[in-house]
Amino acid sequence: MARSLKKGPFVDHHLVAKVAAAAGSKRPIKTWSRRSMILPDMVGVTIAVHNGKNHIPVLVNENMVGHKLGEFAITRTFKGHGGDKKSGK
């Protein structure tokens, strides 16, 4: 279910402060906040989003505005379905 428009987008306050401080910096901003929505202020900033194991660098562009950071850092690795083990070699 989508978030109510009267509530507005959710972004962690510490992430907004880090983005404002690192406006001209090339260094990625590390965050564990996958739930934060991408705002227009974040365009052009590299944010390293935690996927449960390590941080995945995400370069934010204008097409990502309105999506959540967690959508761009995949958490599951698909190794393929089980099959005939003899034919794999």
Curated annotation (Swiss-Prot):
Keywords linked to the UniProt accession: Ribonucleoprotein, Ribosomal protein, RNA-binding, rRNA-binding
Pfam families: Ribosomal_S19
Gene3D superfamilies: 30s Ribosomal Protein S19, Chain A
Molecular function GO labels: rRNA binding; structural constituent of ribosome
Family annotation (InterPro entries): Ribosomal_uS19, Ribosomal_uS19_bac-type, Ribosomal_uS19_CS, Ribosomal_uS19_SF
GO cellular component, one term: cytoplasm
GO biological process: ribosomal small subunit assembly; translation
Entry similarity comment: Belongs to the universal ribosomal protein uS19 family.
Job of this protein: Protein S19 forms a complex with S13 that binds strongly to the 16S ribosomal RNA.
Annotated protein name in UniProt: Small ribosomal subunit protein uS19
Source organism of this protein record: Stenotrophomonas maltophilia (strain R551-3)
